[in-house]
């Protein structure tokens, strides 16, 4: 059976005043995993307690600090933060950390920024080795949500991962961002499914609940799983209707 992870930055936010309570709400909705973005602004003790209480998994979080890896001057600060992020991931049982490339910086050429990104990820792979945690580089759309971001192409993201050439480094494939950029899943992922460490879904337009837009998310997930993807699917959407019943309906519609 497919496994789904609730991004509790958005899901259950209306009913869970305390962030850790959103973990309990996700568990009550029948989900077996949650994910979130930054960890440095969270009460990790409260999160750990909720995880232990519910026996729910934390599927992933952001590798902090979220600074531009396209700037070579940021590499050492990012590696220091990566070590700290790995320790937090291990404490919470998370298997995936998410990295963003950073902005497309005008003071550097595209080639220079790519080289900086590859260098940071290569060094990061050494830090990750043996930790049980993988890092997913996430392409984001630059048409709506992340204007000025360096990495909007899934294929380029995969090419960067292949240039690094380490099992510790893969990509996060966000179906919403990919669709906004006009990509077809089979065209950009075909033959390289093993590089995908995590998947995100939301519908378009609006980045809302699956089924409210024009992306056939069930079809795209069917294709990904048929190719051999065996990880969790992160529900990273802005819910029109929050709560357990709405989330259960979404999971069912996506093959859960």
Where is each model-derived feature located?
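Short, conserved active-site loops that position catalytic residues or coordinate cofactors/metal ions
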Residues: 29, 56, 60-66, 100-102
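Conserved beta-strand positions in the central sheet of alpha/beta enzyme cores
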Residues: 35, 60, 98, 136, ...
